[in-house]
């Protein structure tokens, strides 16, 4: 019995709950509209616009002005977009890219690196990827009836997320002092 391989618990498996793609333009108008078209072309979904929380005169931003757009992708499409985004980063992330709640995020400089054909009328936009990880059973915290908390032992930690990234994508996690390209 000791020689047999220990079976893994399927409830402990980590999966991607959602992937959020964000382009923050910093101004409303034509550039923001073109950025939303890039996200729509990439994800096949209609993006949502984010408004400024408060006025910043030095940046020329007014409160409630639309300054960014984002789209939330789930399922197989999220995995494909995450794979292409990590390919741009060469599967290298910094340790500080991972949060304590087991999520991680990174940014890319140019959206055309993801395989979208360059269009001069659109321009080039950078974007942020934010990945939320979960385990089976997280629904108890989100459901409408009989909500409960996810236990501490079952939550995804920073170490769990980093280990998942290294195993699933054979990724490299760098410390801040090491150089990173991308």
UniProtKB/Swiss-Prot annotation:
Subunit annotation: Component of the large ribosomal subunit. Interacts with DEK3.
Family per similarity comment: Belongs to the universal ribosomal protein uL5 family.
Phylogenetic classification of the source organism: Eukaryota, Viridiplantae, Streptophyta, Embryophyta, Tracheophyta
SUPFAM superfamilies reported in the protein's UniProt record: RL5-like (SSF55282)
Biological process according to GO: translation
Gene3D superfamilies the record matches: 3.30.1440.10
Keywords, in A-Z order: Cytoplasm, Nucleus, Ribonucleoprotein, Ribosomal protein, RNA-binding, rRNA-binding
Additional free-text comment from the UniProt record: There are four genes for RPL11 in A.thaliana.
Protein name per UniProt: Large ribosomal subunit protein uL5z
GO MF, one annotated term: rRNA binding
The species this protein was found in: Arabidopsis thaliana
One Gene Ontology term, aspect cellular component: nucleolus
């Amino acid at each position: 019995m000791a020689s047999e391989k220990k079976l893994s618990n399927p409830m402990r498996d980590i999966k991607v709950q959602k992937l959020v793609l964000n382009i923050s333009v910093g101004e409303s108008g034509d550039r923001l509209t073109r950025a939303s078209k890039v996200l729509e072309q990439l994800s096949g979904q209609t993006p949502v616009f984010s408004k400024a929380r408060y006025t910043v005169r030095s940046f020329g931003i007014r409160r409630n002005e639309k300054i960014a757009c984002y789209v939330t992708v789930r399922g197989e499409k999220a995995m494909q977009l995450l794979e292409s985004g990590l390919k741009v980063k060469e599967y290298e992330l910094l340790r500080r890219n991972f949060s304590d709640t087991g999520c991680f995020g990174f940014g890319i400089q140019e959206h055309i690196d993801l395989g979208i054909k360059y269009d001069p009328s659109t321009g080039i936009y950078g974007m942020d990827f934010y990945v939320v990880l979960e385990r089976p059973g997280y629904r108890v915290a989100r459901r409408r009836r009989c909500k409960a908390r996810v236990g501490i032992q079952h939550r995804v930690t920073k170490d769990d997320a980093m280990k998942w990234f290294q195993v699933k994508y054979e990724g490299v996690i760098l410390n801040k002092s090491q150089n990173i390209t991308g």
